[in-house]
């Protein structure tokens, strides 16, 4: 035995952190930051996308829809016209708290003013119509729908517009190009080139036709620049669309003699002019219908030129212009149509064919469909608008039908409008859409991530079966827009992503990311004068002071002022020479003072070249805008005046990483963390972790269950406060003021204007995932708060910071094989001191309904139940709050009338003699499920008689909330933030854990073999830094890609009086002997994940059986058995365990008679009889017989064996012994 270790005074884990709290200002955790780069801008509100989008829908989206559908006319268009005018939202009937309690939808009444015009008399009838209760978004970006919080996830889809793609011809190897014209709503046009140089088109996915047929037909449509148009008169149709006309139109592009595309297509085209082409097109699109000129024109107009049937949307027109009209550098060419033109123009289609010919001839490049310039985000407002449009179109159909049936003179708006289609459309969307999701509320981070998610799935998107590798892969255009790390593992990988920290969605739906503008030259006064009005603020490049505000009209004086302000303090990159006299004004390298700036501003030169300087100006760029610029990363070294220290820097240009001279740089990243999502930016030392493990770390943080006493991490990244604040789970002060009262369930703040605001706290509320939401005040009476301060913590926050786990002392060492294969050994201290204890709240509900035999009743008077089982029920038959319950205890007593069919002959006789008194009832009480125990914390009763809104046929609903306190135990899943996950294998007594030289036992033992192959070294650096910071009594922030370096960690370890390598000799707690080698020890932040052993463990002896095969059901939810499959049978065969195998396949499974007799034999202690015929064998024979095969079963002596066809003959054997927990009538 080694000598006893001398006693050492234990230093506290973390010294109390006091940020100079004087009772007046808000207390916040202070962190020592290792960041060297300051973010150029603050993080935006992290749920801004959701809030802004819904606001847009309320303000503009609905207005667009009503304008689109107005006026609704009758089928003749001569009698009635219905116009939708202004609309208003009323006040919601209940607030969000009540809606959650009562299982209602948080919604506001939508009313719209409607005007009915009777065209025959000129009379106008006005009325205000109620269009249903419209679900409203809460301040946290969620919807409360039927009592549950839901989130509408943004959808990432292919943007409307035209896309060019190349496909190799397998025989010749030539690149043949195709084009797809995708509208927001309406018919698709798909163009393709074949190897014989014929260009064909598919209209609305119908048959292929030569493109010249379409070109000839639309050449007769005379379009105006606003999108409206008309057909050429009948007698002139012959003059349009001749061969010479078509060849002339494409002469400038169709220039390769070996491949004359238009001529090859004309040769395949049976028509010769617009008239013939219209008829031919109609024949191809509507085969079987008689082709007339009128029908053909109506069809083409409705397919391509009618705004009610074809809509490119503003974004579609923007992409079309960009791809067709702005690709071409010719200045003298036709101008692009206006963005308000949302239908096709004939020249768009001609231009697509032109572009295809150019691509086929080797000019230009096809589009990259996975580029974010070609994919846009449909946010919540647009998704709701789309669904509301469906409802309005259904309503329009109803209105038109009613208009044709009613007398115009007596028609009223109320009589014409039926709101049911609109209400049903919204119910479909919020209740059943793939994009309206039950919010992940496990912890605040899960909630926030759910609101920032981008899904490529859903209506109009991809399906996970058909999505290939390319669409799932990380693309260079994702930089700063979509996180390259955070995505699910499994079939949805790459199809579901998360917005990066600084990303936002622009008005077109494209993702943008911010960059700091780099100035290489300054515009002289005459250039500023030409700009007329300033479109942005102009600020001093050194100080950031305002020189001229946005919207200022630029005259001579202001233009001079701007140029001088920007030039002052800058260094010239080239000599400045007066163009008129040739006089040298200043040499390169001169710093510009005011006098020099005033001389330069008078020179007749447009730009002054300066040494590049990174300004405070921030531009948000979309992916296709970014491709034109050279962008340097945020870590490029700058001096105190924001000039580059190096002459060349590493930059991004398009998809390439290049080294460029600083003069060529256009922009700089605003922050090192702008690449990743919020969840990923919470991983310290992310840059030292392999991407696969970082992905797991990001995903597992969202699964961390809230613990009893939240503890913010010692080693954070500085993102903890903002994440918690914007998640919606903490309470944030709306305005500045002073706290006048702070109790457990409410905080009252007196604002500066004397008005008092009350903040209600959520106490022990159940989340969607059965975790506990409990808000606690983090302010005291008399404390000053500012708008945006966190005034109450939630279950996973600590002083306003995200706190998903606990700081624990870990050692990386093997221990008796207990941490083999990533298993985790934990100390009993974590159990005893409730360090990893979590609260879980489960909801149980029972309804008393009207049945055919009479109403169900909630009562204490339950047949065949002893007094002991009723001890916790009140006089109503409902369990009281505070009762501790075990599996199978009654929560709510309920009886259901029994049907006549259930009565025996004796019972029917008694019924006939005594009447209703003898009426039998069945016990249908709500009981605690198997494996569940806990304490009742809330009971709610909703009765129709008391005015509660209940579903049809329900008289009363009782809801019971059961609370469980779960300590950490063997089988629970734990993880760090670096993807280092494992299952607790054993809880060791504190005295058996290895201990430090000062006598302190470690809390957790992790396996060192789990580190090298996983390449997540971040966990080791976190452990070292955590130990040093804990000893020195402060918390640290080590931001991603800008965190602490190895030498800084070593210095801190030495400063804390710890070994520089972070390793220490440990002693075995059982023997007191030293371990052979020093061990890495330190404080790591560990999470307990939502995969708890208590939810997973399950055992069955007898239980329910499948109806057809009579085999036990599967899964814990069905109280199922363990499947003994084909491979397991092979294993027993290999051992020759014949009797065990026979039992498995018969009495333990589907030998119906045998299993009852076996059960009986075991109970009575008799020998077990031989097994019978399994039910699945009978099923197999029946299946073979159903194929028309005559199948007989013969015994060993070749005599036929009779197999009973149904269970009736076996039921005699089942009398008295119920293996399944079913009533006899339920077989």
From Swiss-Prot:
InterPro entries listed in its UniProt record: DNA-dir_RNA_pol_bsu_external_1, DNA-dir_RNA_pol_su2, DNA-dir_RNAP_su2_dom, DNA-dir_RNAP_su2_hyb_sf, RNA_pol_bsu_bac, RNA_pol_bsu_CS, RNA_pol_bsu_protrusion, RNA_pol_Rpb2_2
Record-annotated disulphide pairs: none
Enzyme Commission number(s) of this protein: 2.7.7.6
Keywords noted in UniProt: DNA-directed RNA polymerase, Nucleotidyltransferase, Transcription, Transferase
Annotated GO MF terms: DNA binding; DNA-directed RNA polymerase activity; ribonucleoside binding
Record GO biological process: DNA-templated transcription
Complexes and interactors: The RNAP catalytic core consists of 2 alpha, 1 beta, 1 beta' and 1 omega subunit. When a sigma factor is associated with the core the holoenzyme is formed, which can initiate transcription.
HAMAP family: RNApol_bact_RpoB
NCBIfam families linked: PRK00405.1 (NF001616)
Family per record: Belongs to the RNA polymerase beta chain family.
Name of the featured protein: DNA-directed RNA polymerase subunit beta
Taxonomic lineage of the native organism: Bacteria, Bacillati, Chloroflexota, Chloroflexia, Chloroflexales
């Amino acid at each position: 035995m080694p000598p006893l270790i001398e006693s050492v005074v234990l230093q506290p884990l973390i010294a109390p952190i006091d940020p100079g709290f004087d009772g007046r200002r808000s207390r916040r955790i202070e962190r020592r930051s290792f960041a060297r780069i300051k973010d150029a801008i603050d993080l935006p509100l992290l749920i801004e996308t959701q809030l802004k989008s819904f606001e847009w829908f309320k303000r503009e989206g609905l207005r667009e829809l009503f304008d689109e559908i107005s006026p609704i006319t009758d089928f003749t268009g001569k009698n009635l016209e219905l116009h939708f005018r202004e609309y208003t939202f009323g006040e919601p009937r209940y607030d969000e708290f009540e809606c959650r309690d009562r299982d209602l939808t948080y919604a506001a009444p939508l009313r719209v003013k409607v005007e009915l015009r009777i065209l025959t008399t000129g009379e106008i009838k006005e009325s205000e119509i109620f269009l249903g209760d419209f679900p409203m978004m809460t301040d946290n970006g969620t919807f409360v729908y039927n009592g549950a919080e839901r989130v509408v996830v943004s959808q990432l889809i292919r943007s409307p517009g035209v896309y060019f793609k190349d496909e190799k011809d397998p025989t010749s190897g030539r690149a043949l190009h195709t084009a797809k014209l995708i509208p927001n709503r309406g018919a698709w046009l798909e163009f393709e080139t074949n190897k014989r140089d014929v260009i064909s088109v598919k209209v609305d996915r119908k048959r292929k036709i030569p493109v010249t047929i379409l070109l000839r037909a639309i050449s007769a449509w005379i379009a105006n620049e606003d999108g409206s148009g008309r057909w050429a008169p009948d007698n002139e149709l012959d003059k349009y669309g001749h061969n010479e006309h078509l060849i002339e139109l494409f002469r400038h592009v169709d220039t390769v003699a070996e491949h004359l595309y238009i001529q090859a297509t004309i040769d395949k085209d049976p028509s010769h002019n617009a008239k013939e082409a219209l008829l031919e097109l109609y024949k191809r699109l509507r085969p079987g219908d008689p082709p007339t000129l009128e029908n053909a024109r109506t069809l083409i107009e409705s397919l391509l030129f009618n705004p009610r049937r074809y809509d490119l949307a503003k974004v579609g027109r923007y992409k079309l212009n960009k791809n067709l009209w702005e690709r071409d550098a010719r200045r003298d060419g036709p101008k692009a149509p206006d963005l308000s033109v949302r239908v096709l123009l004939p020249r768009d289609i001609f231009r697509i064919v032109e572009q295809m010919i150019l691509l086929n001839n080797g000019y230009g490049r096809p589009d990259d469909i996975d580029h974010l310039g070609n994919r846009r985000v449909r946010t919540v407002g647009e998704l709701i608008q789309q669904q509301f449009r469906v409802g309005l179109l259904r309503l329009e159909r109803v209105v038109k039908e009613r208009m044709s049936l009613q007398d115009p003179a007596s028609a009223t708006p109320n009589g014409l409008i039926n709101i049911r289609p609109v209400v049903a459309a919204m119910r479909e969307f919020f209740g059943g859409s793939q994009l309206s999701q039950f919010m992940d509320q496990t912890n605040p981070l899960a909630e926030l991530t759910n609101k920032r998610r981008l899904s490529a799935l859903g209506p109009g998107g991809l399906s996970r079966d058909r999505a290939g590798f390319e669409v799932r892969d990380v693309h260079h255009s994702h930089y700063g827009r979509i996180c390259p790390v955070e995505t699910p593992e499994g079939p949805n990988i790459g199809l579901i992503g998360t917005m990066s920290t600084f990303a936002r969605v622009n008005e077109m739906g494209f993702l943008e990311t911010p960059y700091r503008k780099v100035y290489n030259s300054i515009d002289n006064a005459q250039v500023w004068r030409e700009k007329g009005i300033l479109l942005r603020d102009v600020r001093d490049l050194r100080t950031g002071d305002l020189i001229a505000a946005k919207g200022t009209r630029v005259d001579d004086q202001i233009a001079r002022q701007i140029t001088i302000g920007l030039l002052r303090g800058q260094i010239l990159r080239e000599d400045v020479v007066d163009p008129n006299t040739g006089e040298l004004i200043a040499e390169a390298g001169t710093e510009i003072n005011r006098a020099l700036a005033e001389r330069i501003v008078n020179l007749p030169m447009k730009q002054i070249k300066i040494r590049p300087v990174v300004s405070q100006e921030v531009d948000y760029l979309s992916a296709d805008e970014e491709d034109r610029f050279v962008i340097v990363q945020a870590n490029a070294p700058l001096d105190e005046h924001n000039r580059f220290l190096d002459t060349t820097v590493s930059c991004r240009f398009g998809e390439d990483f290049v080294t460029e001279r600083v003069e060529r740089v256009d922009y700089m990243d605003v922050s090192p963390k702008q690449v990743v999502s919020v969840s990923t930016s919470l991983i310290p030392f992310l840059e030292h972790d392999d991407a696969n493990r970082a992905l797991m770390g990001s995903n597992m943080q969202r699964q961390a269950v809230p613990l009893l006493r939240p503890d913010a991490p010692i080693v954070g990244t500085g993102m903890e406060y903002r994440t918690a604040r914007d998640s919606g789970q903490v309470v944030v002060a709306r305005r500045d003021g002073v706290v006048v009262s702070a109790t457990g369930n409410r905080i009252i703040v007196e604002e500066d204007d004397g008005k008092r605001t009350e903040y209600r706290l959520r106490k022990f509320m159940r989340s969607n995932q059965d975790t506990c939401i409990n808000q606690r005040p983090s302010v005291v009476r008399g404390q000053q708060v500012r708008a945006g301060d966190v005034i109450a913590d939630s279950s996973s926050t600590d002083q306003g910071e995200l706190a998903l786990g606990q700081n624990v002392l870990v050692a990386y060492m093997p221990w008796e094989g207990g941490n083999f294969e990533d298993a985790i050994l934990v100390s009993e201290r974590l159990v005893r001191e409730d360090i990893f204890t979590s609260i879980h709240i489960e909801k149980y509900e029972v309804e008393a309904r009207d049945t055919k035999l009479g109403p169900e009743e909630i009562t204490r008077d339950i047949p065949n139940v002893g007094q002991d089982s009723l001890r916790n029920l009140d006089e109503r038959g409902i369990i009281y709050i505070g009762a501790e319950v075990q599996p199978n205890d009654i929560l709510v007593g309920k009886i259901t009338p029994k049907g006549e069919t259930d009565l025996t002959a004796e019972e029917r006789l008694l019924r006939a003699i005594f009447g209703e008194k003898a009426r039998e009832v069945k016990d249908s009480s709500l009981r605690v499920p198997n494996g569940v125990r806990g304490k009742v914390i809330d009971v709610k009763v909703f009765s129709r008689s008391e005015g509660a809104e209940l579903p049809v046929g329900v008289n009363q609903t009782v809801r019971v909330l059961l609370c469980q306190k779960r300590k950490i135990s063997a089988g629970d899943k734990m993880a760090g933030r670096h993807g280092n996950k494992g299952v607790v294998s054993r809880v060791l007594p504190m005295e058996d854990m290895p201990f430090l030289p000062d006598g302190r036992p470690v809390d957790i033992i992790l396996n060192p073999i789990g580190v090298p192959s996983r390449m997540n070294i971040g966990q080791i650096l976190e452990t070292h830094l955590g130990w040093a910071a804990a000893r020195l009594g402060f918390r640290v922030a080590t931001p991603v890609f800008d965190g602490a370096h190895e030498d800084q960690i070593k210095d801190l370890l030495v400063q804390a009086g710890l070994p520089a390598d972070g390793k220490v000799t440990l002693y075995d707690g059982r023997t007191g002997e030293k371990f052979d080698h020093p061990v890495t020890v330190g404080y790591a932040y560990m999470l307990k994940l939502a995969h708890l052993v208590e939810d997973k463990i399950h055992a069955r002896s007898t239980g329910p059986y499948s109806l057809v095969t009579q085999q036990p059901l599967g899964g814990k939810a069905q109280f199922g058995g363990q499947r003994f499959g084909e491979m397991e049978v092979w294993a027993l065969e290999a051992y020759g365990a014949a009797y065990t195998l026979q039992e498995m396949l018969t009495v333990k499974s589907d030998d119906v008679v045998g299993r009852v007799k076996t059960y009986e034999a075991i109970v009575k202690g008799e020998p077990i009889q031989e097994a019978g015929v399994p039910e699945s064998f009978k099923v197999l024979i029946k299946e073979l017989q159903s194929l028309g095969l005559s199948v007989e079963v013969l015994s060993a002596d070749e005599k036929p064996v009779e197999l009973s066809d149904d269970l009736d003959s076996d039921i005699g054997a089942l009398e008295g012994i119920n293996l399944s927990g079913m009533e006899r009538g339920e077989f």
